[in-house]
Amino acid sequence: MKQLTGAQIRQMFLDFFQEKGHAVEPSASLVPHEDPSLLWINSGVATLKKYFDGRVIPQNPRITNAQKSIRTNDIENVGKTARHHTFFEMLGNFSIGDYFKEEAITWAWEFLTSDKWIGFDKELLSVTIHPEDEEAFTIWNEKMGVPKERIIRLEENFWDIGEGPSGPNTEIFYDRGEAYGNDFSDPELYPGGENERYLEVWNLVFSQFNHNPDGSYTPLPKKNIDTGMGLERMTSIVQDVPTNFDTDLFMPMIGATETISGEKYRNGDLEKDMAFKVIADHIRTVTFAVGDGALPSNEGRGYVLRRLLRRAVRYSKKLNINRPFMFELVPVVGEVMKDFYPEVLEKKDFIAKVVKNEEERFHETLHDGEAILAEVIAKAKEEKTTVISGVDAFRLYDTYGFPIELTEEYAEEAGMTVDHEGFENEMEKQRERARAARQDVDSMQVQGGVLGEIKVASEFVGYGTVATESNVVALVKNGEYTDSLQAGEEGQLILDVTPFYAESGGQIADRGYLLADGVKVLVKDVQKAPNGQNLHKVVVEEGTLTKDAAVKAIIDTKNRSSVVKNHTATHLLHQALKDVLGTHVNQAGSLVTSERLRFDFSHFGQVQADELEKIERMVNEKIWESIDVEISQKAIEEAKEMGAMALFGEKYGDVVRVVQVGDYSLELCGGCHVDNTASIGIFKIVAESGIGAGTRRIEAVTGKSAYELMNDQVGLLKEAAGKMKTNPKDILTRVDGLFAEVKQLQKENESLAAKLSNIEAGNLTDSVMTVDGVNVLAAKVNVADMNNLRTMMDDLKNKLESAVVVLASVNDDKVNILAGVTKDLISQGYHAGKLVKEVASRCGGGGGGRPDMAQAGGKNPAQVEEALAFVQEYVKSVSK
């Protein structure tokens, strides 16, 4: 067996299948751009879903890839086991209705055993198959020469996700030798069992049946191959190391952590070894995820990153690292992965900045949070319970930034659990909107429909013309072929030549009409058919439309004109965002309609008002410069050398369409644009907001829509000026004057309230009682707010010199409570914080504070008198 690096194994796999006629699919972004059902890209096949479910027909039915993936369903096991990871690479080869079992098995065996490739000893390989898969058995036994005793039949060797494609699978296992298990009485010591000796190398799935809704299985018209090989596991076998963490894919990060911490990996301390592994795994995940546009936050993908970083920080304390350091590992990850993922090193400064910022935020609260957690655990043990309440867990999350899973890990070490349901109840009360976690879902759907069968050619000519003579070459109604559509009927059709743009790249579809003698057909929408043609959704308004009919296709030019203004404006906006906010900004989604444009982009903070103003002005300056928009076809490599922006998640062919706005903007884009920026007229931002997980959104209008918006705003300004009895240019002066008047009135009101408070405080001194030699005053008073309550408390403490005072007021059915204890009584054990907590609890509230002054709130005004009566009991209890 050869000595290979992880990078060499990856490249060798791709080279092998390229020799077998496969197209190499680039590794897609970890953030899914075309599949809202996925939180992360979680497998090699996840990015190929569009091919397997028939929505898109691939140019080459043979595909291979090395796909970066994230799975987060068992984070708590990372570091504890030899092979659990949150970030991993899946190597795969796929067939979309082309080759099947014999080729898949033959090539897998060749790659693993040939001296030209991996060069495994055949005697160390075993395979598992489904008990009824005789075809696979025959191929393995008779053609590959694997003896019967090393072909194990297992019931679980059947890939099935419910409805949709399914089929048997075969797995290949490598025997690492007796050092990893030699107790043959162990019922799990076999290929496919839970053991460390026989490691799964490769899983080949033979997708040959359709699992129908009624539970039956029928053969698929086209059989598919879907295989997966984990790069990290394969590397551990080739490099003959005990765990994936001991490979060259992880050891550089572990080595850097050794240098930072002064501790040693594999020095006999299993707890420290676990910390090294957690840090190495989590920094890989965070580095790649941030590089692909995800940012730490409290929801969705951002929450996963925050949880991983904070878990790593928590484990770093076991290595005596008490400062931000994870950001220093980002360039180390980049160096390890640079052969296949050069973009990590290109973005390392930005990624490190994001990681450092998140580390610093957590370090600010970590010490206090751990102290609070220690108190909570100690209190629970005193109360003879092994459960940390949901309220306490939520407080740790909300105030100290402890993800619930982190609290659960701390609790587990203390032999306790967390009331997760109680935590969720507290979350539900607190959050303003539902944050339902999306689950990773299965990768394929039911195959079917006639659209995938339509192979007739169709040419889009809409870049240069708005009307053309065409022929209807395919006509579909209710998912089936049809020869005609009557007036009032809806259907789908394909034209041999069409000026109608199909929705893509965020740009909405054209609309318009198809006209013939006595026939008028409304084109409502246009989408891409599975084989790439423009598929028109239509409704017949007049006459009968027949297949092969000659029609005149005419787009709505007024609608198109507004759309192209907004589309070119998004390109200008994209570049302006990079110029103002930084090169880390990347498009995360867009919508271009005739009325407005919406642009989503990666950014880790709110865009400030002055930044928005600068961005808006930059875009308008480019419009006013009347720059020609040039569109050309270029080879992909030439376009990239020119500096053209390629968008995350987009797949490009060998020849791409380049949209260039002077020397300012250069993007790969298949959309429609203005000929000159002057056509846009004017650009106006109407909103900027966060849409979660480090993604911001700008909404804007151009042309007529921008004019109408500004006209409306001028109208509102005039109306407001009229109500203030001034003119628009003087409205700010008028507003400043009104604010000054209000401020003066507030000042006079506060002065009057203070005087009244002082008078009431003087009257209250007559109500002071002596309890066990201590002056006690507990009274309900009439004041406007807590500030007035504090003023009154200060007056009373000064007047009484030595006293325990509790004041309560009721406003809008809410109770404010303030407790005060003079310095001489604090030394005797009296504590305002403890007292106010008890008083508040008796009128439906809570609170606390310092020994000398503390405040609280209550919800039940009717119980205030009863709550104040407790003050005497408290004084008696302390004086005993």
From Swiss-Prot:
Its EC number is 6.1.1.7. One of its GO terms (molecular function) is catalytic activity, acting on a protein. Pfam families: DHHA1, tRNA-synt_2c, tRNA_SAD. Zn(2+) binds at H567, H571, C669, H673. Belongs to the class-II aminoacyl-tRNA synthetase family. It catalyses: tRNA(Ala) + L-alanine + ATP = L-alanyl-tRNA(Ala) + AMP + diphosphate. This is Alanine--tRNA ligase. SMART domains: tRNA_SAD. Catalyzes the attachment of alanine to tRNA(Ala) in a two-step reaction: alanine is first activated by ATP to form Ala-AMP and then transferred to the acceptor end of tRNA(Ala). Also edits incorrectly charged Ser-tRNA(Ala) and Gly-tRNA(Ala) via its editing domain. Its cofactor is Zn(2+). Its main location: cytoplasm.
